[in-house]
């Protein structure tokens, strides 16, 4: 099963795609899609749409796992909500099955602690995916964490 994890954001959208087979998991691809703060919001959303619309058929996920909106700072939350709307539109158009997870669910699944730090989550991702270095940037690492949590949620990987 191929799972694409998405960490939504207007400035930086992280993605991480893993391939799960029985109890093994391999990274297929990960990275970020960025938009410039100098552009109008509508142009930034259009750019996210275009990039995601291109990325989904390349990665061909069987499931997309998306971080559910979780309130931190209102100014940050608005951009995330706008990016999520674009993501949901693309996923609907591409007929992609969707699983939504909250940040505490992801942290709990990977570290055993719902308030884990970013570095603790990155180390868990590095360990579970047998990566030589910590996955970077943070948004891509978070997306891989979301994909790993989805694989556990679907019963493909035991924690």
From Swiss-Prot:
Cofactor: Mg(2+)
Top EC class for this record: hydrolase
Catalytic activity entry: Endonucleolytic cleavage at a junction such as a reciprocal single-stranded crossover between two homologous DNA duplexes (Holliday junction)
Keyword Hydrolase belongs to the record: yes
Key words, A-Z: Cytoplasm, DNA damage, DNA recombination, DNA repair, DNA-binding, Endonuclease, Hydrolase, Magnesium, Metal-binding, Nuclease
Subcellular location: Cytoplasm
GO process terms (BP): DNA recombination; DNA repair
Cross-referenced SUPFAM superfamilies: Ribonuclease H-like
Enzyme Commission number: 3.1.21.10
UniProt GO molecular function: crossover junction DNA endonuclease activity; DNA binding; magnesium ion binding
Comment on bound cofactor: Binds 2 Mg(2+) ion per subunit.
Record family assignment: Belongs to the RuvC family.
Assembly and oligomerization: Homodimer which binds Holliday junction (HJ) DNA. The HJ becomes 2-fold symmetrical on binding to RuvC with unstacked arms; it has a different conformation from HJ DNA in complex with RuvA. In the full resolvosome a probable DNA-RuvA(4)-RuvB(12)-RuvC(2) complex forms which resolves the HJ.
Name this polypeptide is given: Crossover junction endodeoxyribonuclease RuvC
Native species: Thermosynechococcus vestitus (strain NIES-2133 / IAM M-273 / BP-1)
Lineage of the species this protein comes from: Bacteria, Bacillati, Cyanobacteriota, Cyanophyceae, Acaryochloridales
